[in-house]
């Protein structure tokens, strides 16, 4: 009992201040209770009497002990006997280790520590939280592994380890080993049994604060099933967070909210690996985050990062335009709901972040972006305008954006899906690596989906519909897409359009992004084409004459007479009666040409030599009519040939399609050859394929420009866009009649037209300027001719100078019509995707055939191998140089398209589709130009 005399050297209590636990803690018990009633001095009793003391639930809490403290004296004696037993064992161990401290000093320090811990003051008015009441089930592990565990001698209590080991310091007589044991975590506990310490200095002592230990601000609690052993290190490591100590222990400890351990440590469930969405820490402190998280990710917004756009430049252009759209994109969640379907992520509720701009695109800083973090192609774009995804081959540095596919649905098997708003997506599966998402769809689905997703209007025009009435059934005919619903992939800034969508918008009609086009009640997909080629004659009425069902695409003959121009006069457009003077003409133009050539009339045009010659106005200007006859190739020497014979032409086309050596014409070619005559030259034979190219050459197209009003930049650009729309339609019609082009896959046909439409237009501009005005002006159309003065007054003078180079090259090289026609076809075939075409073999055969035709056309004028080779080099070099020239036009066109609202420039529908879908790819180098010569 001599240990109580060691209390004398303690620091005296300050009068008027709060009671010091180091001074009064040994006597904080009721008088005449306990085994030491006679050792209490009289001078310390007044101190104790002024302090409210509550020992209930502190020394031996009911939830942990399971016994009723009715006999307080018995309990106190049992508790102190247990402590003395623990002390005696510790003394024996440490005495054997050769401790330098004297036994009385060690005895005093050990018992002081135990009593100070067990008899700490408690009460409802206490300002600082007391240590938790429960203790571990093992023995009093106060000094590390030196104490052997003795479960029968220890109280059967559980809970968080007492903050005794975080005490700042003891009295001066304590040994160094004891002080060290108060500061560090006992090494006797295994890492799985080490319980949480307070994150700051111990709140139970009024001494010097202890440096906070680097504990995590959020602790992941791993839930496990099964019962716990009695000697477990504490239930907090297993199971759900719960209140510590129960209700009985609440009187001795500060109130702790559920899920928060002692010291303000938050307990959060471990993040489920099935959910890829990032979680946000429930407690945001300056302390380091839990292991595995970035130290910077301490706030809610640190987990939200702007998604890294892949190097798919078509996506880059679409995303850039969406960010520039003020009205529809800056609206936050409202704008996002208009473009993306609602998410149903299981972790959405745990991340209440109002960031509608980037749904499910956030990822932790220390992790890689999810493969499916960019659902732009199928989530927010209109179905008819989805960009055809292009892989860059084995060396692709980015993962292609993949759309979310409903499990079990094959987009290739449902061509007639209703196009309503996309359904909510199922819960996201674990992220897959690049290439795994492509396995979910069948290999054949890629061809059909890409065909229906790129160039819907072009697909309408390439397939001529029969106008069959829809099938009758118990339901009404499904609603069809409005004729003028905008087909623009990039959401431009509400620019006016010449299509019917502008009139609908002006009338106040609500813009519907996904008009219903469902058939047969099939499930819907967000990226199916908005054009149903069969059973819907009301789709695209302006292009109805150019549609046809798919059944006609797989006819057995390689070339059919229906694919050729019908019997239409190439001069006036009337019904042709046969091939007269080498050209398919009507009887009226035949007689006119014969009389004009034999009578040697000198006709003069009252206008500008650009009069319209058609069935009604063919007699208005004989000069322009005769000029058109000569341009078509009519000569008097060709009258000896028989009338147009369908069988002969089909046989000739089949012969041309087969690989043949140059200069060895067969019988079919000889029968279908015709003469051409020009001053100073002999009569020469024209190859049949070139003759056919002449017959299918489109007529001059008018721009509809009003020359009575002063020119403005917006009016000129709008007129050029309208002209470009008509010329694009003419290119599609021309390509349909092109021998060999219909043998290609429909996707390849659309791709080739989209890649080469600008080259064909500027090449035709150069030819018209060369033929009509000798390259002195830019002959866009008969009603839109720009001289140098008008070029300077326009806002695209530098662009006009660029386009002016082509007619000047024509003048320099004196290009013939036969050479021009062959070069024009090669321009259609000079750009392909990086991965190639679906029907690559047929494409290469077709291109080789037209290269041979160009050699034949060169041989019509050039005599000798050397001169023909030089000519071939000059013409093919001109084709190669067009790539760089057209790239400047592409860039200007895309910039004008993006700024169309600010510039007040209108873009028609089909032209908008092509610009938005393919120009970003072309400018980004995602296409492969086919060059004749190396640079």
UniProtKB/Swiss-Prot annotation:
Phosphorylated on multiple serine sites. Several of these sites are hormone-dependent. Phosphorylation on Ser-294 is highly hormone-dependent and modulates ubiquitination and sumoylation on Lys-388. Phosphorylation on Ser-102 and Ser-345 also requires induction by hormone. Basal phosphorylation on Ser-81, Ser-162, Ser-190 and Ser-400 is increased in response to progesterone and can be phosphorylated in vitro by the CDK2-A1 complex. Increased levels of phosphorylation on Ser-400 also in the presence of EGF, heregulin, IGF, PMA and FBS. Residues 1-568 are annotated as: Modulating, Pro-Rich. InterPro entries: NHR-like_dom_sf (IPR035500), Nucl_hrmn_rcpt_lig-bd (IPR000536), Nuclear_hormone_rcpt_NR3 (IPR050200), Nuclear_hrmn_rcpt (IPR001723), Progest_rcpt (IPR000128), Znf_hrmn_rcpt (IPR001628), Znf_NHR/GATA (IPR013088). GO terms for cellular component: cytoplasm; nucleoplasm. A motif (LXXL motif 1) lies at residues 55-59. Gene3D superfamilies: Erythroid Transcription Factor GATA-1, subunit A (3.30.50.10), Retinoid X Receptor (1.10.565.10). Coiled coil: none annotated. A zinc finger (NR C4-type) spans 569-589, 605-629. Residues 689-935 are annotated as: AF2. A motif (Nuclear localization signal) lies at residues 183-187. Residues 681-915 form the NR LBD domain. Residues 1-254, 331-378, 418-438 are annotated as: Disordered. The modification Phosphoserine is found at residues 20, 81, 130, 162, 190, 213, 294, 345, 400, 678. There is a cross-link at residue 388 (Glycyl lysine isopeptide (Lys-Gly) (interchain with G-Cter in ubiquitin)). One of its GO terms (molecular function) is zinc ion binding. There is a cross-link at residues 388, 533 (Glycyl lysine isopeptide (Lys-Gly) (interchain with G-Cter in SUMO)). Keywords: Cytoplasm, DNA-binding, Isopeptide bond, Lipid-binding, Lipoprotein, Metal-binding, Nucleus, Palmitate, Phosphoprotein, Receptor, Steroid-binding, Transcription, Transcription regulation, Ubl conjugation, Zinc, Zinc-finger. Residues 456-548 are annotated as: AF1. Residues 232-246, 335-350 have a biased composition (Low complexity). The steroid hormones and their receptors are involved in the regulation of eukaryotic gene expression and affect cellular proliferation and differentiation in target tissues. Transcriptional activator of several progesteron-dependent promoters in a variety of cell types. Involved in activation of SRC-dependent MAPK signaling on hormone stimulation. Interacts with SMARD1 and UNC45A. Interacts with CUEDC2; the interaction promotes ubiquitination, decreases sumoylation, and represses transcriptional activity. Interacts with PIAS3; the interaction promotes sumoylation of PR in a hormone-dependent manner, inhibits DNA-binding, and alters nuclear export. Interacts with SP1; the interaction requires ligand-induced phosphorylation on Ser-345 by ERK1/2-MAPK. Interacts with PRMT2. Interacts with NCOA2 and NCOA1. Interacts with KLF9. Interacts with GTF2B. Composed of three domains: a modulating N-terminal domain, a DNA-binding domain and a C-terminal ligand-binding domain. This is Progesterone receptor. The lineage of its organism: Eukaryota, Metazoa, Chordata, Craniata, Vertebrata. The gene is PGR.
